[in-house]
């Protein structure tokens, strides 16, 4: 399975296994066990490098020293040195009996007590230099074990199911951090979708996080070392996305230091787990479990607060704090975070969080923060803070997000971008509320929405109905009210009906003028299509609108110009992807392809380059998965097939069983369409004939007189024939001639249907086996050809359809 399939399988099983436990709670247990497996596997990998085999681990990998070892010429100091070496290198020690693999090998002897003992031992054996990273990290899991069942037996059963569910997650290589991280993020997002209002406590939707990350990364792209900080870190995903985006420019991710603070202990533990599992060095992880507004961050060691006091200033702060949370503003006027700007009101801490973030920025730093849109226009203390932020030139951009984009709340939200020092005095305002797709109950930013917003913010673009750079004087004139509709009107033109046109015919000139972009692109077309009736109205003078438009030389020039712009693009993609599969930098390649598409579209009218980018992104997601497999498993993985596992009920329980095979990289259906087309065509012919027979049954039922449908040869709900009774009726010949003819026809078809179904089963089975053999014996050249058709052809086809879509939309606007 690829990482998406594995993540989906684990989620589906976990969601069933949690039973009555709240999603918000159950996530802490499964994610805790995944983290324990990660640490355990990591230790075993370290031991393997040190030459420890399984027998040696079983004998000597123990916390306690065994006296009998003296008789075997092993000294206690050697044993203690082994433990010390593991702790020094990893930051912790897990004994043999507490390894995740040992739990699995115990089988029916495994018990919940094994987990309790292991977690207790882990806390005891953390290296002192790694206390801040690992101390109490399993407390939430340890205290929650009792909630997994009413007694020891049921708890043991639940935990056993859990550890067997996650045992296949790979954790043994640098590339696999992405698999592990993907699954971890996938589970968090799905638990958030099922956690209602509590989701906001630990999760920022990936797309929002990615948008914030891209804006920050562009600002920091030329730096060689950075510090980033999230004062309300939740699961840590926002920090991780920032780090990943910045690392694309820096190259060395080990030069990024992560700071995080989180109030809730269980969520704080998620932050640390997530950071560690992404391969971030422990020395680059600095976290604190505390109240951000009450306990500001200057770093200090608890054993010597005064001597180790060090104010924290970072390159970037990112946060998604709780919206309009109550807080205690008493005696905060002299707090250096708020002294310059003012103190947020008691009932709404939004600006308290913002000012906290701003305080910790370096002079050349950048911050992004998610806030309820009320911060843009509410008065009182908040109005004064807003004024001071504007006058001190800190607000760089405001981005209005789509409604209902966060789990558990429909509150309208914004992202505010601020900088400690700016050369400009204006503010960019972006209304991105209209760009999204509906996914389940929530709205979700598409890849094209994220790129469009990022480009507008980083390039500070004015785009009608989307973005506008506002001068400070205009903001002053509006009394520092930053409500987005005051500056950017993204509303659609209201639909109107022209009474004169309705009564006397004709098309209002205003409606024709609304299509100005098309007339600019097709300068001679308007005269071909319309004839002026008077100054205010025109009439359509062509009988076939579509034919007239498609036959226009202007339109043909547009289509041909578009095609010419992508001349050689297939070959370009082949060079970029096919010829250097193992060397493609997966994290950077999509941006490279995107730049090429945007370059080719320069000067092409009407085409929205971001629509083209969305087509690329849709295809890239599949390409990236395949490239990951090829780069981690080798090119031979393209000639591999995997068991197709499905879930079936057996004795009332879901059981996973094999149902044929699937291509590991190359899909069965692609091989059948391109290399086994004769067999596939024969099967499709049988399927077509079976569909005809089924349709014939329905027609025959319709032809039967109503009184005949009450007879035994039709079922009770009059939707199908009863075949044994049909044969009896034919034999008895007690129906009229017309009905008898119908029965004979459907009976004959039924006999043919039985034979065809057997043929279909036999031929489908044979084709399936033949496809398996074909994939396993593919030549390298055949693999390249198939991957070209899987990766590149859909992208070329999708881009090729854009002009057709534009013309169709143009025709529809004239016709409406």
Q: Which residues make up each language-model segment?
A:
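Short secondary-structure boundary/capping segments
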Residues: 275, 332-335, 383-386, 413-415, ...
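Conserved S-adenosyl-L-methionine
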Residues: 198-319, 324-328, 335-341, 345, ...
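Active-site lining segments that contact anionic ligands and/or coordinate catalytic metals
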Residues: 313-314, 348-350, 364-366, 392-396, ...
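Conserved Class I SAM-dependent methyltransferase catalytic core
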Residues: 16, 22-38, 345-418
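Conserved P-loop NTPase
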Residues: 415-455
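Non-catalytic, mostly N-terminal accessory regions of nucleic-acid modification and defense proteins
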Residues: 1-216, 283-286, 400-403, 427, ...
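Conserved, well-folded catalytic cores of nucleic-acid-processing
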Residues: 16, 165, 169, 186, ...
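Short, well-ordered loop/turn and helix-capping segments at boundaries between secondary-structure elements
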Residues: 41, 277, 323, 363, ...
């Amino acid at each position: 399975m690829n990482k998406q399939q594995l993540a989906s399988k684990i989620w589906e099983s976990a969601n069933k296994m949690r039973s009555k436990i709240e999603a918000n709670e159950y996530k802490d247990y499964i994610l805790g066990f995944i983290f324990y497996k990660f640490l355990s596997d990591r230790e075993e990998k370290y031991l393997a490098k040190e030459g420890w085999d399984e027998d040696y681990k079983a004998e000597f990998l123990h916390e306690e020293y065994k006296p009998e070892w003296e008789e075997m010429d092993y000294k206690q100091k050697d044993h203690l040195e082994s433990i010390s070496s593991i702790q020094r290198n990893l930051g912790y020690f897990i004994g043999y009996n507490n390894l995740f693999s040992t739990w699995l090998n115990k089988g029916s002897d495994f018990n919940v007590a094994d987990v309790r003992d292991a977690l207790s031992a882990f806390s005891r054996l953390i290296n002192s230099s790694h206390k801040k990273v690992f101390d109490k990290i399993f407390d939430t899991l340890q205290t929650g074990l009792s909630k997994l069942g009413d007694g020891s037996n049921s708890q043991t059963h639940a935990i056993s199911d859990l550890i067997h569910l996650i045992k296949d997650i790979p954790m043994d290589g640098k590339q696999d951090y992405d698999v592990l991280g993907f699954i971890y993020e996938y589970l968090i997002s799905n638990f958030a979708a099922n956690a209602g209002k509590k989701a906001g406590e630990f999760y920022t939707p990936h797309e929002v996080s990615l948008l914030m990350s891209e804006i920050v990364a562009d600002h920091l792209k030329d730096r060689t070392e950075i510090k980033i900080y999230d004062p309300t870190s939740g699961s840590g995903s926002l920090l991780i996305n920032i780090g990943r985006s910045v690392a694309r420019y820096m190259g060395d991710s080990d030069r990024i230091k992560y700071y995080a603070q989180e109030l809730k202990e269980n969520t704080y533990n998620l932050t640390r787990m997530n950071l560690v599992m992404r391969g971030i060095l422990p020395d680059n992880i600095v976290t604190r479990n505390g109240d951000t507004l009450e306990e500001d961050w200057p770093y200090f060691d608890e054993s010597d607060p005064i001597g180790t006091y060090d104010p924290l200033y970072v390159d970037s702060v990112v946060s998604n704090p709780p919206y309009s949370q109550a807080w205690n503003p008493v005696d905060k006027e002299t707090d250096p975070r708020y002294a310059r700007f003012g103190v947020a009101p008691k009932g709404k801490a939004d600006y308290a969080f913002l000012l906290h973030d701003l305080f910790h920025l370096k002079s050349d730093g950048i911050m992004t923060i998610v806030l309820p849109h009320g911060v843009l226009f509410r008065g009182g203390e908040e109005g004064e803070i807003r004024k001071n932020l504007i006058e001190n030139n800190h607000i760089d951009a405001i981005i209005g997000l789509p409604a209902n984009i966060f789990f558990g709340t429909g509150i309208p939200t914004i992202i505010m971008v601020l900088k400690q020092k700016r050369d400009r005095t204006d503010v960019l305002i972006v209304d991105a509320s209209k760009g999204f797709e509906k996914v389940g109950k929530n709205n979700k930013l598409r890849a094209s929405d994220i790129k469009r917003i990022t480009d507008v913010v980083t390039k500070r673009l004015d785009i009608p109905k989307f973005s506008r750079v506002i001068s400070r004087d205009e903001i002053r004139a509006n009394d520092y009210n930053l409500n987005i509709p005051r500056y950017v009107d993204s509303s659609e033109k209201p639909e109107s009906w022209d009474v004169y046109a309705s009564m006397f015919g004709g098309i209002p000139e205003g409606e024709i003028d609304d299509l100005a972009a098309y007339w600019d692109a097709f300068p001679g077309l308007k005269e071909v299509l319309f004839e002026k009736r008077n100054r205010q109205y025109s009439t359509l003078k062509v009988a076939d609108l579509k034919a007239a438009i498609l036959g226009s030389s202007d339109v043909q020039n547009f289509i041909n110009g578009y095609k010419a712009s992508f001349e050689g693009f297939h070959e370009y993609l082949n060079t970029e992807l096919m010829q250097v599969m193992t060397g493609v930098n997966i994290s950077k390649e999509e941006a490279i392809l995107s730049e090429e598409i945007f370059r080719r579209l320069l000067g092409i009218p009407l085409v929205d380059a971001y629509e083209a980018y969305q087509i690329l992104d849709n295809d890239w997601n599949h390409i990236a998965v395949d490239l990951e497999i090829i780069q981690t498993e080798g090119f031979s993985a393209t000639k591999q097939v995997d068991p197709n596992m499905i879930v079936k009920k057996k004795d009332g329980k879901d059981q996973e069983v094999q149902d044929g095979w699937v291509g590991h990289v190359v899909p069965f259906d692609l091989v059948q369409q391109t290399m086994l087309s004769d067999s596939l065509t024969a099967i499709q012919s049988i399927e077509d004939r079976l569909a005809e027979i089924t349709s014939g049954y329905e027609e025959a039922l319709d032809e039967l007189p109503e009184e005949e449908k009450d007879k035994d040869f039709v079922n009770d709900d009059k939707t199908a024939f009863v075949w044994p009774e049909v044969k009896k009726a034919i034999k008895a010949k007690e129906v009229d001639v017309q009905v008898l003819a119908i029965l004979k026809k459907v009976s004959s078809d039924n006999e043919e249907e039985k034979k065809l179904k057997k043929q279909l089963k036999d031929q489908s089975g044979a084709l399936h086996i033949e496809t398996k053999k074909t994939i396993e014996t593919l030549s390298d050249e055949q693999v390249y050809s198939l991957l070209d058709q899987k990766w590149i052809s859909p992208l070329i086809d999708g881009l090729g359809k854009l002009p057709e879509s534009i013309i169709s939309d143009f025709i529809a606007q004239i016709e409406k």
